[in-house]
Amino acid sequence: MSAIPVIAIDGPTASGKGTVASLVAEKLGFHYLDSGALYRLVALASEKHGIDVKNGPELGLLVPKLLISFKNSQIFLDDDEVTDAIRTESIGLRASALAVHPEVRSALVGLQRSFRQFPGLVADGRDMASVIFPDAVLKVFLTATAAARAERRYKQLIAKGISAKLSDLLQDLQERDARDSSRGTAPLLVADGAKVLETSDLSIDQAVKTVLDWYQSAIA
């Protein structure tokens, strides 16, 4: 086991895991890995290069060629600032579609593990606890009902001035859940030893406090 602690937080789309993970990292002074951003970056790059999302081998070969960097809450791809560009619904759907390919997932393993740096790391995604950091000191599966997640996503989009339809978002989330849970490579699941945090009725602050309390217990 590495001496550098990792808190691995997995969960479905729009479960709030990114918000919780980034705040936990901030409270602890740890580094933060948003693994979903990496898949969205591949989605954006593959769109620019005209690569079909069904072409796993070609997508896998694209990953090592990408110049990815995170600076002051901004995300760069080949020196272009793409923080907002990778957060569109269309890129999210594309990322979900290409994430089923083992070639893409294996190509990103090393990059994700490179974020494990002193004094510690909080990583969120779909397979952080089960595949990327199986030796994490704390494994959390953060979830919420599809209805609660769709409503959160709806409010996020409206707040950004992006038009959205709640019924469409709910259907999209249900389809992504089915795809994430049934894929052959690293399906979305509750990892062995993971603590399940149901956030449908929790505030962000309550969820963050729960994870921090679990972490203190884990290292005690």
Curated annotation (Swiss-Prot):
One of its GO terms (molecular function) is CMP kinase activity. It catalyses: CMP + ATP = CDP + ADP; dCMP + ATP = dCDP + ADP. InterPro entries: Cytidylate_kin (IPR003136), Cytidylate_kinase_dom (IPR011994), P-loop_NTPase (IPR027417). GO terms for biological process: pyrimidine nucleotide metabolic process. GO terms for cellular component: cytoplasm. SUPFAM superfamilies: P-loop containing nucleoside triphosphate hydrolases (SSF52540). Gene3D superfamilies: P-loop containing nucleotide triphosphate hydrolases (3.40.50.300). Its main location: cytoplasm. It is found in: Cytoplasm. The keyword S-adenosyl-L-methionine does not apply. ATP binds at residues 11-19. Keywords: ATP-binding, Cytoplasm, Kinase, Nucleotide-binding, Transferase. It is an enzyme of class 2 (transferase). Its EC number is 2.7.4.25. It comes from the Bacteria. Belongs to the cytidylate kinase family. Type 1 subfamily. This is Cytidylate kinase. The gene is cmk.
